[in-house]
Amino acid sequence: MTSAVPLLSRWCRATLAARKKLTHKAEPAFCKGIWWQCVRSLAALSNGPETGDMRGYLTSNYKEVKRSINEELVPSVSSSLLNPDAIFANNEMSLEDIEVYGFDYDYTLAFYSKDLHTLIFNTARDLLINEHRYPKEIRSYEYDPNFAIRGLHYDVHKALLMKIDSFHYIQLGTVYRGLNVVPDFYGKSSEGNTLKQFMDIFSLPEMTLLSCVNEYFLKNNIDYEPVHLYKDVKEAIRDVHVKGILYRAVEADIERYICYGERTQAVLSKLANLGKKMFLITNSPSSFVNKGMNFIVGKDWRDLFDVVIVQADKPNFFNDKRRPFRKVAERGILLWDKIHHLEKGQTYKQGNLFEFLKLTGWRGSKVLYFGDHIYSDLADLTLKHGWRTGAIIPELKSEIEIMNTSHYITTVTWLQGLTGLLERMQVYRDAESQMVLQDWIKERQEMRDLARKMFNRQFGSIFRTDHNPTYFLRRLSRFADIYMESLSCLLNYDLHHTFYPKRTPLQHELPVCSEQQNTGTFRIPLGKEMAQIK
């Protein structure tokens, strides 16, 4: 019997051609179930070679699968690319049901340039030297924006920075001590308080500073306590905020640090013109928010918001009933009046969500709140208060743009095909076959490393490990109904739009096309279609 792949490939083409004839549509890129079924069913149609030439038989199957993928599947996938400005849904949600829109400030209404992370890193590094007596030689380390990614975990006692998947397993090749990888470190992550996760965007300079100081101590054979280092770096990063260093620097050079202001203004104006209620709850101080919003929207920015709350101390704001609101007068003066109403055009400090709900009546699923921090901004609102939530993930756009490249598509489709070959051909246990399979395993690992490094050379994508979602994505899926790169993605949709989550097959389900393709519709807007929904 000869290779089963030509027969299988002809069956695939015939099946897809018949489907195209019936639906009058080309096969969408993400409807790949039939193709993966073809690849992964390869050996099932074969009884093995008649001649006993196992190497030739396996090589023939390998070449034919690779040819079919490169000539037929890759062009199909490349014809329908995702738009990085789309909104993606974890839960079904209709904007028609939303009456009230709430926002965080930092990295939600205000987006910052990379200069801000350099400022945080340099300032915290100097605080370590000047106030914690760390060696002045660490001043030679500069901030590297390409080192860390959001969502990493740090083992406080072992000084290890690592990437963990949704099943709490450490991804191989992503454990770093200092600035160097720790080889062959893999397995179930440790439990308890030893691991700390870095979830917000402001944590990127903190992770980099931790790694740089660890690197200095390791290179110079200096004995140190990792727990003390972690606490000192954490305190230095906190002081950059608490002591007002960051706020003063941004206010003094706002054009350098804040970007994309016109996009935020367009979203707020659209919602206001359609009669939606809006509020702002942020941990940032009043003067900082005021100067930023003056730059982004204009001096009348408060007219857009029904309620403005600063220095809210989230996530405590969502849980602590004891703290009352306090009105902020001009120049930041705090008034002692008891608050009976939250007035439009005024600014309030602290408070708590329970009093907020009582004074506004904005409860349940008619409220949609946007923030960038999955825990501090979104978790309690989803779990305890029933608000709908939207996560702002600035990294999303660049990751989708990478996934849309021909290099990534070719790499990942072949990785899937090679995995299918390995899965089916592992039944051949003779020495010659095992040599071929070991070569395939090595190539598969190379493909996985290549795909990972397209996003970040050290840690890969913030959304997935080699074959599982990351721990970060697991929490994002749990606490955010929708997620997007920025608020400006809302401009691509009218306010009657319903977001539907994409049906994905479970491990025990057939990889058939989801109902969205069977009905000829796309639930995730493609790049060439976005103009039609504006």
From Swiss-Prot:
Gene3D superfamilies: HAD superfamily/HAD-like (3.40.50.1000). Mg(2+) binds at residues 104, 106, 372. Substrate binds at residues 234-242. Its cofactor is Mg(2+). Keywords: Hydrolase, Magnesium, Metal-binding. The keyword Metal-binding applies. Binds 1 Mg(2+) ion per subunit. InterPro entries: HAD-like_sf, HAD-SF_hydro_IG_5-nucl, HAD_sf, Pur_nucleotidase. The keyword Endoplasmic reticulum does not apply. It is an enzyme of class 3 (hydrolase). CDD domains: HAD_cN-II. Its EC number is 3.1.3.-. SUPFAM superfamilies: HAD-like. One of its GO terms (molecular function) is hydrolase activity. The active site is at 104 (nucleophile), 106 (proton donor). Signal peptide: none annotated. Belongs to the 5'(3')-deoxyribonucleotidase family. NCBIfam families: HAD-IG-Ncltidse (TIGR02244). This is 5'-nucleotidase domain-containing protein 3. It comes from Xenopus tropicalis (Western clawed frog).
